């Protein structure tokens, strides 16, 4: 399977026919700029390209009234003055003789994409469309939107395929109130929207855009609004919202399909959003969503009005859907005060409805939290006033670190025969090794732990590590004997440092003691998941128990491991599963899959050989980009699991700001 790109050049036909400063930014060049970007990067040719077809009137009727559909159809025969008069009856809308055709194509593209994904023709995809849709309501155009493309896609998925749980993620900078109204009382659709709000002073100026609008009737708790009350929100703020609000709810909801209202006016440089999130942030957000719903993601373009920023952001999303590694994130991973206040308001509003939030831990913030303005000065060299100047934005976009994908995605060096591991296709069996003399030199400090066969294995593992650091292999799995696991991990740490890795994240599970000579200089972040008690040796070395509940395990990953990993910004991740590691198949796969994002996939997983037959296939699939299996029914974290996380967060959040999930008391 692959990635679909649904498009039709006719969607560039509708355009503004009169002077209107509010509407002029929704122009045909938005589509052509995005498509040109995909072509220049060679991404279009890697997709399954589908030519959009018009949605039928019956399909439009899944959301819209017959009278409204007829009214839009009538615009095909109106002259300019009549179109202008009709447009003025709506808020921030213009009609054109080709609007009906274009809007039907946009809706049809969304439906085609759902069909392609749910029939298994592709794994995921993007519908590149205009006009956008998320503001459109049952009987009203609104905010450049004519038909509600994503709402239609959700209704179509429910009606045609019988889906019972659909997640809609709306990261457009405007509130998609049209989607909210349509599914306000529907518990089968979980709608998450973040949006510029500024305490109700930003368009569409609605009280129901605030955090306390949670849905009605049976739909209470299934509308999740995260209002941004300042401009300048950046990468760290968006990540914090995903890690501390969206993903906990999404895992508990367990969707069968993820729809993304992919508006890129929330990206840097956009005159509407005035936000600071750089294009590569959308690659990370996309990859974080790929662990849900079996990876079935249908993204539909919404807003985005700075052409260069829009094109770059679309490319970032598509290359992630295609399976390319995520590029590094720019900037400090420090959420601002206003973002944390918004996150706390959402958690407060949603806690009655979600077990995952009832177990949430919220340490008090330190006074060193940066404001958006302070971070803007560091990122752009000027404050985020109106439109960002080209001479500030273009150099920033040029900084995007687009590493080519390594020729080998996943490699394995194992003491167990390959046939016994049932590895997925495309995984390379590593036969190469570093020189014996070099291996012996690295193993000298642990001579008692390495037998002759262990040295041969270590040589292969060092060869894997070199391949990852040289950009020839994206990630790898290796096996060792139980006796040699800790020593192997220590050797790998030292070799990473010798090869001038700036930061190495070590996630060690089971009976693996921290190396005695492990430096505390900020180059190694050591997290040991073992035992019954949490402990802190320093701000870079600590341990925590392995939770036994699904809720506790998800809180460990989303509330501790990923915030630490993103805050540390490692060059390399070493994931070691030692004796008595305690991980089940699905847990190991999810941990590996989630750790790919912060490090661009550069992971070396070392597994003691007693566990490799059980874990090899699921680990390899996760590292290879396949969606990890479900953890099973959601179960609430125990008080002991919550206490362990609380202990660590309260002591670490002063250094690791992404652990913060709440604003200080008034």
UniProtKB/Swiss-Prot annotation:
GO terms for cellular component: cytosol; histone deacetylase complex. SUPFAM superfamilies: Arginase/deacetylase (SSF52768). Residues 1-323 are annotated as: Histone deacetylase. The keyword Cytoplasm applies. One of its GO terms (molecular function) is zinc ion binding. It comes from the Eukaryota. widely expressed. The active site is at residue 135. One of its GO terms (biological process) is positive regulation of mismatch repair. It is found in: Cytoplasm; Nucleus. Belongs to the histone deacetylase family. HD type 2 subfamily. This is Polyamine deacetylase HDAC10. It comes from Mus musculus.
